[in-house]
Amino acid sequence: MGRLQLVVLGLTCCWAVASAAKLGAVYTEGGFVEGVNKKLGLLGDSVDIFKGIPFAAPTKALENPQPHPGWQGTLKAKNFKKRCLQATITQDSTYGDEDCLYLNIWVPQGRKQVSRDLPVMIWIYGGAFLMGSGHGANFLNNYLYDGEEIATRGNVIVVTFNYRVGPLGFLSTGDANLPGNYGLRDQHMAIAWVKRNIAAFGGDPNNITLFGESAGGASVSLQTLSPYNKGLIRRAISQSGVALSPWVIQKNPLFWAKKVAEKVGCPVGDAARMAQCLKVTDPRALTLAYKVPLAGLEYPMLHYVGFVPVIDGDFIPADPINLYANAADIDYIAGTNNMDGHIFASIDMPAINKGNKKVTEEDFYKLVSEFTITKGLRGAKTTFDVYTESWAQDPSQENKKKTVVDFETDVLFLVPTEIALAQHRANAKSAKTYAYLFSHPSRMPVYPKWVGADHADDIQYVFGKPFATPTGYRPQDRTVSKAMIAYWTNFAKTGDPNMGDSAVPTHWEPYTTENSGYLEITKKMGSSSMKRSLRTNFLRYWTLTYLALPTVTDQEATPVPPTGDSEATPVPPTGDSETAPVPPTGDSGAPPVPPTGDSGAPPVPPTGDSGAPPVPPTGDSGAPPVPPTGDSGAPPVPPTGDSGAPPVPPTGDSGAPPVPPTGDSGAPPVPPTGDAGPPPVPPTGDSGAPPVPPTGDSGAPPVTPTGDSETAPVPPTGDSGAPPVPPTGDSEAAPVPPTDDSKEAQMPAVIRF
């Protein structure tokens, strides 16, 4: 190439870069914002990045979020804001801030003109409702939830945001004094803000997709079911977490509220006085009053975590199983990782990852019995027999350890996700349903070689980390990442993961109740990647056989869960509690065997006892359930008025601060008032405690942290006194949490199926 040609090429490239499209200052309902335009190469493509745009006013402790008043001049949106207040990994100090409700936006730009009408993808981070942030952990100066790779490779707008977590986000008395769900309402405020303002950034406000993982995936699910989001969401993706997961809904919030109140010195005898005291308590003290034990647990971690969403009769008007008609027009993808339960199994049973340690029958039986408390001895025996059937033919430690992981994967993630998919499909009108299983093995070097895809391993591939930080990844990792970004962004554009601007490795068929089809995501995908009936025999066991077992009384129940005082040793099972539970031997009463026959047939959704696995709606499922609404009889009304229209830039004197849109669109619907009294108190059955995700994106080779790995979960506090007693009697009658001294409060039984 001659010198003249090189000069011409150089000038052409410089002209392309100089003339690349960019947004500049953007007008929002709060005022003008200006981000950064990042060049992506010599051809002129770029991405506009806005960090730290407020979507709500600074928070007040244990109160709903409020609209932001706006600002004067142009807001420089160039740096991530602090996360919401939460405990550090040592749980002896806090970081973050109460003023934390900010969002971040990535907008891909071409060479000629700024983008218009792009699909919008809003990410909700996980972290057990205890920790996390909208930008995630930092790895090689690249944050986990940096949206650049998704935005530029998929040609979509990506939005991430902060929401309140831990006691400040989810503490509730179970009534109107402290209704809870503040973190969910923060999420809703962010979604509504995007709906009203994203057109100014080049997005299509009528094509919004939510996606999230773990507690974020469950949050996505809950947001689609809430009547507050009617008309705001077009599509949704739940990764390793749905509203029906046993760790999502707290059925005994008063118990946990009292534990925190005792720690900070607030009265617990009267809910109103307790609530007033908690609201004026130092938010840092509230955060540190709740600690999760991370080692030496006597019971599964599921028992120790308490600050999660509640059924408040308003934002979540009823049990999520009865709200799927609200998502009838929302396209939905849901799936799990093939060893989602590994990190939790390794905490509950540390021998899992230790080659010189063995898992015994007694160990596994004890674990099973602690997950099946409400079904007593028979529930423990039948479940143990079903899961250990292969041990006679293969008694190896690898097989036994895999069994423990499969058990926790099924209970915590896979079974509830399969039920959620069936519910969505059964209620869907125009919406499509898709299922997946992520099976690309974990990169964690300290794990045994048999470990598959652990909890949160999928996040790094969705966010394109193999491209953003290529030195830590292999070509096969980039293959997986490319496929996931293609499927996810195609789905955001069209509602079909196969159709869009990105080529996919194989066709992903929709999920139906007849075929139970799912796509297995691996490094090498083809026609054989589309499979049927994932772990059907185990799914049928939980939704049919186990469900049919009688619920036991408190005297018959096996282990008593811990009381919440992480400093005290949990009380072991009663009865012959001096010895560890012994697995059944010989013919233990011929426990029921999981249904056989045509295993390819989809499992029958559970019915009957509502205390057990979620039950699909019966009768006219097309009619959405009406939430309790005072004496009005009408469901909450989503934002109306001018909420669908983008804010109009000010005219005349531009020096005056812009005025946000008027009307009620900026705030969430106001709960009805009247003489109806406080919303119903949730039952005490299921603790809904979320598992704690792995920590991690630390500098070692690409193991994705669960969101905000820099912090650790935070749990039960206070001396509870006597050990709590599992729910008693007929599970169809939801027990009401005690309202007197919390030392008499019941500890929820964590599993319903």
From Swiss-Prot:
Coiled-coil positions: none
Mapped Sequence repeat ranges: 559-569, 570-580, 581-591, 592-602, 603-613, 614-624, 625-635, 636-646, 647-657, 658-668, 669-679, 680-690, 691-701, 702-712, 713-723, 724-734, 735-745
Region spans: 17 X 11 AA tandem repeats, glycodomain, O-linked (mucin type): 559-745
PTM: N- and O-glycosylated.
GO MF, one annotated term: sterol ester esterase activity
Major localization listed first in the record, in broad terms: secreted
Transmembrane spans: none
Entry-listed glycosylation sites: 207, 558, 569, 579, 607, 618, 629, 640, 651, 662, 673
Region annotated Disordered, chain positions: 555-753
GO cellular component: cytoplasm; extracellular exosome; extracellular region; extracellular space; membrane
PROSITE patterns: CARBOXYLESTERASE_B_1, CARBOXYLESTERASE_B_2
Active site: 214, 340, 455
Record's subcellular location: Secreted
Keyword Plastid included in the entry's annotation: no
Signal peptide range in chain numbering: 1-20
EC top class, as a word: hydrolase
Catalytic reactions of this protein: a triacylglycerol + H2O = a diacylglycerol + a fatty acid + H(+); 1,2,3-tri-(9Z-octadecenoyl)-glycerol + H2O = di-(9Z)-octadecenoylglycerol + (9Z)-octadecenoate + H(+); 1,2,3-trioctanoylglycerol + H2O = dioctanoylglycerol + octanoate + H(+); a sterol ester + H2O = a sterol + a fatty acid + H(+)
Any GO BP annotation: lipid metabolic process
Regions of compositional bias (Pro residues) in chain numbering: 668-683
Residue ranges of the region described as Heparin-binding: 21-121
Disorder noted: Maturity-onset diabetes of the young 8 with exocrine dysfunction: An autosomal dominant form of diabetes characterized by a primary defect in insulin secretion, exocrine pancreatic dysfunction, altered pancreatic morphology, recurrent abdominal pain, and fecal elastase deficiency. Disease onset is at less than 25 years of age.
Protein family membership: Belongs to the type-B carboxylesterase/lipase family.
Function: Catalyzes the hydrolysis of a wide range of substrates including cholesteryl esters, phospholipids, lysophospholipids, di- and tri-acylglycerols, and fatty acid esters of hydroxy fatty acids (FAHFAs). Preferentially hydrolyzes FAHFAs with the ester bond further away from the carboxylate. Unsaturated FAHFAs are hydrolyzed more quickly than saturated FAHFAs. Has an essential role in the complete digestion of dietary lipids and their intestinal absorption, along with the absorption of fat-soluble vitamins.
Subunit structure, interactors included: Interacts with CLC.
Protein's recorded name: Bile salt-activated lipase
Organism: Homo sapiens (Human)
Gene name, Swiss-Prot/TrEMBL: CEL
